[in-house]
Amino acid sequence: MVKDYVCVDIETSGVRVKWDKIIEIGAVKVRDGKAVDTFSELINPGLKLSPYITELTGITDEMLKDKPFIEEVLPRFIEFTGDDVLMGHNI
């Protein structure tokens, strides 16, 4: 059984893979069954969110307007996860 892993939750601007963007990455690093570290970043998708996505996630355009783009966040996330197994739903 895997004892060291990272649980990941990703929020997006929609479900259309070609057009929609990641707006939040959240993760918890687990060591021997215990949470030891967290990662949480809001991401500016460079597009306006639909009212549906705002209602679903609680994330607004105002919250994202001054946040970094994915190109800045992704290297930090990769560093956080390292070589760990990633776990998540529908990722």
Locations of regions flagged by a protein language model:
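Conserved non-catalytic scaffold segment of RNase H-like nuclease domains
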Residues: 1-91
